[in-house]
Amino acid sequence: MKVNYKFRTKPYKHQITALERCTGKTAFGFFMEMGTGKSKVLLDDIARLYTENQIDFAIIIAPKGVFRNWVEMEIPIHFWEEIPTYMSSWQSPMSSGRKEEINRMIKATGKMKIFVMNVEAFSSIKGRDVGEFFGKKFGDKGLIAVDESTTIKNHKAKRTKTLIKISKLFKYKRILTGSPVTNTPMDLYSQCEFLGEKMLGFSSFYAFQARYAVLNSIKMGKISFQKVIGFRYID
């Protein structure tokens, strides 16, 4: 790690290690326990990529209950002071003042632009449209990150499908979570698919499930379906 990086807050050794490991990677997951400072690592990563002229836009997506923390605490505390920055965030319903603020951010030049959204917004058409707009406009030099990425573990959820589609528009992708598995190993698939198509080497969720899940055929009258009763090959 370069020693001349102008960190706003001094990183711990494990944070430097995480930053070193994501260097040069367009897709990366910060699987770090709560309280270890993964938010700071992401912001240092974004700042580093900006100084290397790799990105000039980042969209950070987090659960509704915490996404304001990024705006009010994490970014002001940790993002590098030397970098000129324009930050804005999602609001629903969108006020005229916020629309003007976002338009100024879009037009800003010579600055790192950071936009923060709550993940729940991507279940709506408006949220989807905003994400797609930013991806098409800034994605070639942009980064998309999902904080608490288990919020997109359900491969059937509308927001999951939307964010996987939008992620393909961005050059850099990051996910953050204490543990990517909260229920079953199947939780991994959509989070990794967000990082990149076939990231786990499977063409679909069902191919992934067929490999690692033990399935039992259930018949209820004229209806039949596959039920997961266990897992294999996960050691």
Language-model region placement:
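SF2 helicase/translocase NTPase motor core
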Residues: 1-160, 165-171, 199, 203-228
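PAPS/PAP-binding and catalytic site of the sulfotransferase fold
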Residues: 43, 74-75, 184-196
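Conserved helicase ATPase motor motifs in RecA-like P-loop NTPase domains
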Residues: 33-35, 170-185, 193
